Amino acid sequence: MSGSTGGRSFADIITSIRYWVIHSITIPSLFIAGWLFVSTGLAYDVFGSPRPNEYFTESRQGIPLITGRFDSLEQLDEFSRSF
């Protein structure tokens, strides 16, 4: 028989008022923080991904697709020069 760790059971935790007071504040706060992180564009800046209007520029309208197996480094250099 296993010993008790002295912790509260899961049923006791989720039926307590304290649990719901804490989580009724933190869960919506995390959702709002994530929504603001994405909607303000900060996610694009932090992760370095291009914004939706920056995928295709005036000078580069084609898809940067690597087609050759052995000359892939040259193709990558060509794509990076077009930025």
Swiss-Prot record:
It is a single-pass membrane protein. Heterodimer of an alpha subunit and a beta subunit. PSII is composed of 1 copy each of membrane proteins PsbA, PsbB, PsbC, PsbD, PsbE, PsbF, PsbH, PsbI, PsbJ, PsbK, PsbL, PsbM, PsbT, PsbX, PsbY, PsbZ, Psb30/Ycf12, at least 3 peripheral proteins of the oxygen-evolving complex and a large number of cofactors. It forms dimeric complexes. GO terms for molecular function: electron transfer activity; heme binding; iron ion binding. Heme binds at residue 23. Belongs to the PsbE/PsbF family. It comes from Oenothera berteroana (Bertero's evening primrose). NCBIfam families: cyt_b559_alpha. Keywords: Chloroplast, Electron transport, Heme, Iron, Membrane, Metal-binding, Photosynthesis, Photosystem II, Plastid, Thylakoid, Transmembrane, Transmembrane helix, Transport. The chain crosses the membrane at residues 21-35. The keyword Transmembrane helix applies. One of its GO terms (cellular component) is chloroplast thylakoid membrane. It comes from the Eukaryota. Pfam families: Cytochrom_B559, Cytochrom_B559a. This b-type cytochrome is tightly associated with the reaction center of photosystem II (PSII). PSII is a light-driven water:plastoquinone oxidoreductase that uses light energy to abstract electrons from H(2)O, generating O(2) and a proton gradient subsequently used for ATP formation. It consists of a core antenna complex that captures photons, and an electron transfer chain that converts photonic excitation into a charge separation. It is found in: Plastid, Chloroplast thylakoid membrane. Its cofactor is heme b. HAMAP family: PSII_PsbE (MF_00642). With its partner (PsbF) binds heme. PSII binds additional chlorophylls, carotenoids and specific lipids. GO terms for biological process: photosynthetic electron transport chain. This is Cytochrome b559 subunit alpha. The keyword Metal-binding applies.
